[in-house]
Swiss-Prot record:
Its main location: cytoplasm. Belongs to the TRAFAC class YlqF/YawG GTPase family. RsgA subfamily. This is Small ribosomal subunit biogenesis GTPase RsgA. It comes from the Bacteria. Monomer. Associates with 30S ribosomal subunit, binds 16S rRNA. The gene is rsgA.
């Protein structure tokens, strides 16, 4: 029996990296019967007589798992966020940040397509950048978007980490990876003028060695609907609200209608981004109305 990490999942095959070699395996039939689905990043036990034919036997306990993208045991996520074509959506960005916070994964925000902004639009974006930096999120922003300053900073952050690239279709995840490691030569797609959405140029999830990091390039998405938490848990995944919660009058304050709420007071005085609070209210309503089908 061998131990390794699932590097790629495609059409029922699982490529496992172990001892400097890559082994192609299939999962045993009892995986499906038990409702177990191996994902990229899983630490596993397997058996193989050669590198072409093997069987995946056991998935070891995960420290975390993302649903979109489907990847496990992640240290850090780079949220590639387009500011144009498609236009910047702080709602979509905050959905991804909440998902990462809920799994204990450190986010890095990378703004792409900054070269398409007018000077006035770039000034407006700087306010957004500063807002997220005040929360404590690392934000990489440069015009042009893939300048050496931003790329150099990102390389330092990624060193020694298992990383996932996530973001809306067409945001530039594969383009960013190509700049980090030009020899990858990943396929990239332009935005469909009809839909204003990118073609899904990445169709599989795979872990790639980029410098001293293992990076998952994952398929993009056009929406992000997953909230695997309760309304009581949601405020914990907004760091600026979590920091103020002890100052609220009521323990378990949801920062909506409660009196003497420190979060609403901070909002009133411009210490919390209006867009963040508006998105929080929307997420709260969505969670309150969704069916409780998440798993702890």
């Amino acid at each position: 029996m061998k131990n390794g990490t699932i590097q790629q999942s495609l059409s029922g095959f699982y490529d496992i990296w172990s001892g400097g070699k890559l082994y192609r395996t299939r999962a045993r039939g009892n995986f499906r019967k038990r409702g177990l689905k191996p994902v990229v990043g899983d630490q596993v036990e397997f058996e193989a007589e050669n590198q072409r034919e093997g069987y995946l036997l056991k998935i070891l306990p995960r420290k975390n798992q993302l649903v979109r993208p489907m990847v496990a045991n992640v240290d850090l996520a780079v949220v590639v966020t387009a500011v144009k074509e498609p236009n910047l959506s702080t709602n979509l960005l905050d959905r991804q940040l909440v998902a990462l916070e809920s799994q204990g994964i450190d986010p890095v925000i990378y703004f792409s397509k900054t070269d398409l902004l007018s000077d006035q639009e770039a000034d407006a974006l700087m306010l957004v950048v500063k807002g997220y930096q005040m929360i404590g999120y690392p934000v990489l922003y440069q015009r042009p978007p893939f300048g050496e300053e931003a790329l150099g900073e990102l390389r330092k952050i990624l060193t020694g980490k298992v990383v996932t690239m996530m973001g809306q279709t067409g945001a530039g995840k594969s383009t960013l990876l190509n700049h980090l490691a030009p020899d990858l030569n990943l396929a990239t797609g332009e935005i469909s003028q009809a839909l204003k959405r990118g073609r899904h140029t990445t169709r599989k999830v795979s872990l790639m060695q980029v410098g001293d990091a293992l990076i998952a390039d994952t398929p993009g998405f056009s929406s992000y609907e997953d909230f695997q938490m309760t309304v009581e848990e949601l405020p914990h995944f907004f760091p600026e609200m979590q920091a103020l919660a002890p100052e609220c009058k009521f323990r378990g304050c949801l920062h909506i209608k409660e009196p003497s709420c420190a979060v609403k007071n901070a909002l009133k005085h411009g210490k919390i981004m209006n867009s963040r609070y508006d998105n929080y209210l929307q997420f709260h309503e969505l969670i309150a109305n969704q069916k409780p089908n998440y798993q702890k």
